Amino acid sequence: MTDRAPAVESSDRLSERGSMAYLLWFFALVYLVEGLGQIGGLIAQPLTYYLKQVQGWTPVQITAYLTLFNLPWIIKPLYGLVSDFIPLFGYRRKSYLLIANAAATCGFLLVSRLTVPDQLVFALMLTAYAMAISSTLCGAVLVENGQRLKESSTFINQQWLWYNVAAMTAAIVGGQLVQRLVPTAALHTAAALVSAAPLLVIFGTLFLIDEKKAPMNIQGMKHTFEGLSIAFRRRHLWIIAAFIFLYYFSPGLSTPLYFIMTDNLKFSQAYIGFLGSLAGAGWIAGAFLHRRYLKKLTLKKLLNLSIAIGTLASLAFLFFWNETTAAIISFCAGLAAMIATVATLTLAADYCPRRAEGFAFAVLMSIINLSTALADNLGSYLFTDVFHRKLEPLVLLSAAFTAFAFVLVPLIHLGQKRQGDPAVAAMAPPPPDSR
């Protein structure tokens, strides 16, 4: 072996020692922070409760307000392009990670001092952009290494396992804050607590990531754009994008359910938080179920299984009558969501074109975020203005949308493709011989 400085050994360590362990720890750390720091994390229930109780907003207004924070997630491909080709202080990943997570901490500290929704939106938007940038960088690492090691589903499983460990914790703490504090104090306390989470990523970036300094790569940009041009002329990639959009476009139940639990079923805010933690436990159970029993399935079988389980989980909300049934249904819904997430994200990762993996994966993730945001707004609108705050017809419609995905699976022509096997070897030109 040749002698090299420790600061530039990262890629050699990953290849010589087996990169799996390093990658799994990295994904665990980033997604642990993301589970706490997203708008849907620790601050979610305190924010929703504040807007409902203090501002007197309806489900439609709350959902529309929260949808604003999906914008940074919808434009994720932009962050991928910038970080790939415009190094900041000589680094493509490290500098952006440090700045983004420092901004997230500042944003949450600012939220802890504001009360007016028009002012809160700017501070919360800062945190949303920061979390989206961190997630984009992590996604690029996942696709590049997942295709190389044929372990896309393993990495996705790991990410979402730790995301939901954080989500479980966030749901319990958020519920307790709302139960024990007045709405404004609960919101401010949640923001102050979550402001510490991005510091973990800053620590990991400084002490766990070695990255070579790199100049702006004009030639690499040219080859990647050639790969993108070829990839986006491929009909199959467009079919997959359409499938993912339709798969996730199911009228959302989350905000309507919050109003049902609060106003109709009279659940305490602590119990609502506990139900969120049970959903997180279901996600974790789904992760272990996939690792133990489902990893060997073909991707087609996994997708069909996820649709079947998702449809049944949606229909189960017809029995959302009391605390006991709510607990069982929340756990099952989380389990179904985890299997669906592994199935669809594995599909996305396996079909990303070579030399444009990070950008293409970010595009497909943006499609999921856009579809989910539209579906959530549709669900709240139907619940409020069409179904007159009746949950049952919304549940039936949501289940029907989920079941419709069965019709779409044959259009992808997956055959016997296994999870994690790259399906895009010929979708982009090979990398140039010269460096």
Residue ranges: model-predicted function:
Residues 111-112, 198-208, 394-428:
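Multi-pass alpha-helical transporter architecture, strongest
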Residues 75-91, 285-299, 383-384:
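Helix-to-loop junctions at the C-terminal end of transmembrane segments
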Residues 73-76, 154-174, 365-376:
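Glycine-rich segments within core transmembrane alpha-helices of 12-TM secondary carriers
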Residues 9-73, 238-243, 247-264, 272:
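Helix-loop boundary and gating motifs at the non-cytosolic
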Residues 111-124, 318-330:
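Helix-loop junctions at membrane interfaces in 12-TM secondary transporters
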Residues 6-20, 210-240:
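Juxtamembrane intracellular "pre-TM" segments in multi-pass secondary transporters
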Residues 300-344:
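C-terminal transmembrane helical hairpin of 12-TM major facilitator-type secondary transporters
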Residues 92-95, 178-196, 381-403:
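A membrane-interface helix-boundary motif in multi-pass transporters
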